[in-house]
């Protein structure tokens, strides 16, 4: 899959099949998109931020990214203020800054300008500045490793915020045939096994991490 793609050269032809799967839902009117990306979940969230910015629906995304490795993107000192975030936490991704998208970075490795801690903790600093009316306007969109997604789901549970998670799973066929990427999902009618490639990769946070799990 990815190894074969990495060997392609400019001008090579590729056959694609799609669209397949279920993406993020943006139907909630006039909401505030809060984007959380970690590790290999950073690139898709960057594209999501740009997509939301260009929707022409008046949406103003706010992005938080976390990594324990040096960020593989040019970082800059942000000139965009974010309430609840200390002034010394000012590192942003240059592409986000150029598109006027508020953004902050987090890491446990004390990178310059980054929040020292988990990216979900950084997002919570901002969330705590909001009143109940503002909280109801938020939708969290997250992509990253499972512990980060669980923490994002916990944010949603704690503050009663809608939260959607894009899962990372190994996929063999990626068209729903092999069932190699199934995850356990809790639905109103009970527990079911869903394929991330065609039933996801995006799921409601509480279906992946029910309340009993977010509190663990």
Model-derived segments and spans:
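Short, flexible coil/linker segments at domain boundaries that flank nucleotide/cofactor-interacting
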Residues: 28, 56, 133-135
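Short, glycine-rich nucleotide/cofactor-binding loops
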Residues: 32-43
């Amino acid at each position: 899959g990815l190894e074969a793609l990495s060997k392609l050269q400019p001008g090579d032809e590729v056959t694609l099949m799609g669209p397949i799967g279920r993406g993020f839902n943006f139907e909630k009117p006039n909401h505030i998109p809060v984007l959380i990306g970690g590790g290999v979940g950073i690139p898709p969230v960057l594209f999501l931020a740009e997509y939301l910015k260009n929707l022409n629906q008046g949406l103003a995304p706010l992005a938080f990214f976390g990594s324990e490795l040096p960020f593989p993107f040019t970082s800059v000192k942000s000139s965009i203020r974010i309430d609840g975030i200390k002034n010394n936490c000012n590192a942003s991704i240059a592409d986000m800054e150029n598109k006027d998208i508020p953004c902050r970075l987090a890491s446990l490795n004390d990178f310059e300008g980054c929040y020292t801690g988990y990216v979900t903790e950084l997002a919570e600093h901002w969330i705590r500045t909001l009143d109940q009316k503002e909280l109801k306007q938020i939708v969290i969109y997250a992509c990253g490793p499972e512990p980060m997604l669980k923490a994002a789901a916990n944010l949603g549970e704690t503050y009663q915020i809608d939260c959607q998670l894009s899962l990372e799973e190994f996929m063999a066929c990626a068209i729903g045939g092999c069932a190699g990427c199934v995850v356990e999902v809790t639905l109103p009618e009970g527990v079911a096994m869903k394929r991330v490639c065609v039933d996801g990769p995006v799921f409601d946070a509480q279906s992946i991490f029910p309340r009993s799990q977010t509190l663990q």
